[in-house]
Swiss-Prot record:
Its main location: cytoplasm. One of its GO terms (molecular function) is nickel cation binding. GTP binds at G105, P106, V107, G108, S109, G110, K111, T112. GO terms for cellular component: cytoplasm. Transmembrane segments: none annotated. Keywords: Chaperone, Cytoplasm, GTP-binding, Nickel insertion, Nucleotide-binding. This is Urease accessory protein UreG. Signal peptide: none annotated.
Amino acid sequence: MHDPGEHGHGRHDHDHDHDHVHDHDHDHDHVHGGGHRHAHEHEHAHEHAHGHEHGHAHAHAHAHAHEHAHGHTHEHWAHPGLFSERDAPKDRDFSARAFTVGIGGPVGSGKTALVLALCRALRDRMPLGVVTNDIFTQEDAEFLHRNKALPPERIRAVETGGCPHAAIREDISHNLVALDDLMDHVAPALLIVESGGDNLAAQYSRELVDYTIYVIDVAGGDKVPRKGGPGITQSDLLVINKTDLAPHVGADLGVMERDARRMRGDGPFLFAQCNRSQGVPEIIDHILSAMRRATTTAPPAK
């Protein structure tokens, strides 16, 4: 476990390899004055005309008919929310669809690098399946193919054709089709969904995933954790990636740690360098622990 005193809250002028985990199973002195948030969701109608599924290749989700001039309706969040108030995982039959992990975060934060690292670490331990989301390309799926993350038949690509968060929360149908296709053809024990890059307000529907990981990176500056948003405050695990860039961008890892703890309360977070697999074993521990809890308490298969 990480001792927050290891690197303090001063400036960091040298490289850090923070592959330790903050799981907050012990008491902390938290600054709760500004940390309490409440999420208010307002439902809006969605009339989406969708494309079609292309076998094992990819799914299209295009031609959205919307009510707002800017493109489509959104959930409106008055506050970033508390970790303790996040949506609870659904009790469901995991024989119908395997335990599903959703990985989200801004563009360039390292989501695909994390997916690749997870595939490399877990593919010899259990059968996997991956669904990627991009707006108009299959770039992330192609990256996984080039790097031989998994056999091609275990990867599906969804082209959302619009804002990525809609495909993981408001209209999850195309991702569900891709996940069901993987279940039918390769019978994975663990499924991973990678969202397209989006903003701090993006969060997965619990109808789609059982466990959420939100990835931010140091290159965005040490202010990112305190900006909040459901991804920061209510993901099951927050990953602060690319810690090696801290001295190059003037980011203070101590400040990021302090703010992540303040914003997340008891919610776990950790530092990582996913492209070097630093922190990845700890991420896997969190995933497998959640998977064991969910599958041992799941209702019996029908």
